[in-house]
A protein has these predicted regions:
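Active-site-adjacent loop/helix surface patches within enzyme catalytic domains
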Residues: 1-18, 24, 29-141
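Basic/polar, cationic surfaces and motifs that engage anionic cell-wall
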Residues: 1-3, 18, 100, 105, ...
């Protein structure tokens, strides 16, 4: 799998707790500026170079110190910001299966997208391939959305992300073992647009 890396090293990360291996993959969505794609904003945010004068929204977030392990652009290109062995700062206040501090034991994957538009086929293909690789390398038990580990606080990856499509790609690739770890239920968690029943207000929540 072809992976690119940011021009500037990411410092918004640290070490996981001793002996901790990632057991969860969290799927996010991000667009900077909101609902616009293809620009340098995401890399600038993760490398602490976001210009607050570059966009009105940037003035509200440029101070944040956040990151993710991976970023999948609209065309399917994969960028690695933080090695999966290290702890990226992507989950915030969160809980999964009764355990808090999901950053400690999760891998964060940001898709370039928003709550109001479908994701691209190339993004699903790259995500499926990445999940298969991560499940081969680490004891991953589940794949969940940011909204699943921070319900009511986060909405991403949003109602236009199709968990069933991701599962189908994994099954077609012969990775039923990985598909079985994709947790969210389409009904009540967003998913396919024709089935969405979103449990909290929508909005462009890129972080």
């Amino acid at each position: 799998m072809k992976i690119s890396f940011p021009a500037v090293p990411v410092t918004n990360c640290d070490e996981r707790p001793a002996g901790e291996l990632p057991s969860l993959v969290v799927v996010h969505a991000i667009s900077l500026p909101p609902d616009r794609f293809g620009g340098p904003g995401v890399e600038q945010l993760f490398t602490n170079r976001l210009d607050p004068a570059g966009h009105a929204y940037y003035a509200t977030i440029h101070h944040l110190r956040v990151s993710a392990h991976y970023f999948i652009r609209r065309g399917g290109e994969l960028v690695c910001f933080v090695p999966p062995e290290r702890r990226a700062w992507h989950a915030g206040v969160s809980s999964w299966r009764g355990r808090e501090r999901c950053n400690d034991f999760s891998i964060g994957v940001e898709l370039e997208g928003c709550d109001s538009l479908p994701f691209e086929g190339a993004q699903y293909e790259t995500l499926a391939a990445l999940l298969a690789e991560l499940c081969d390398r680490f004891p991953v038990e589940g794949v969940a959305g940011h909204s699943d580990i921070a319900p009511g606080r986060k909405t991403d990856p949003g109602p236009f992300f199709s968990w069933s499509r991701l599962r189908r790609i994994l099954l077609k690739a012969g990775r039923a073992d990985v598909a079985a770890r994709v947790e969210p239920d389409e009904v009540g968690q967003g998913g396919d647009p024709d089935r969405r029943r979103w449990p909290f207000p929508l909005g462009s929540r890129p972080l």
